[in-house]
């Protein structure tokens, strides 16, 4: 509908944004000066922004998107880029550890994967849980310490599995 058309039109013009922060993100993502498509947003720009909220201070993104100076915007964008690489590395390491934990157990895989490690970063366990669902085709819950003495959980499940209903029976 109307929102979809508005987004399509906005994508056509985003690459010509006068905002230094948007320009910096596009440059760091290697998108050049061409019209953007949805995949550019979903796989290049959004992850750089999202990573900051997952493992850093979200104020960084506010500062980036409101920066008026190109050099300052580029430096802030570079910091977002670094956090995105760190986020990817964290996800890969946690996924490898989770797979090793599951594969090292000789018993059959349970119908619901549940893993907890205090050293995992709580900001990325949802991404890893989704990867485990894809790999093992069953619901997965990962828990990580939040730094305040509590564990945070993230649960993902295959399509058609109602996590909220399952949790009501716990």
What are these regions (language model features)?
Residues 1-170:
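Hydrophobic helix-and-loop "lid/oligomerization" segment in the mid-to-C-terminal part
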């Amino acid at each position: 509908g109307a929102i979809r058309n508005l987004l399509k039109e906005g994508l056509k013009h985003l690459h010509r944004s006068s905002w230094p922060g948007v320009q910096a993100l596009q440059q760091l993502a290697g998108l050049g000066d061409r019209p953007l498509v949805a995949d550019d947003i979903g796989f290049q720009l959004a992850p750089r922004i999202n990573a900051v909220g997952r493992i850093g201070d979200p104020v960084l993104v506010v500062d980036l998107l409101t920066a008026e100076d190109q050099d300052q915007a580029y430096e802030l964008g570079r910091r977002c880029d670094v956090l995105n690489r760190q986020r990817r590395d964290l996800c890969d390491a946690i996924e490898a550890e989770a797979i090793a934990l599951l594969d090292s157990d000789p018993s059959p895989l349970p119908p619901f994967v549940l893993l907890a490690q205090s050293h995992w970063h709580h900001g990325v366990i949802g991404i890893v849980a989704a990867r485990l669902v894809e790999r093992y085709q069953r619901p997965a819950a990962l828990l990580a310490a939040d730094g305040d003495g509590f564990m945070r959980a993230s649960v993902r499940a295959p399509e058609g599995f109602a996590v909220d209903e399952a949790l009501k029976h716990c």
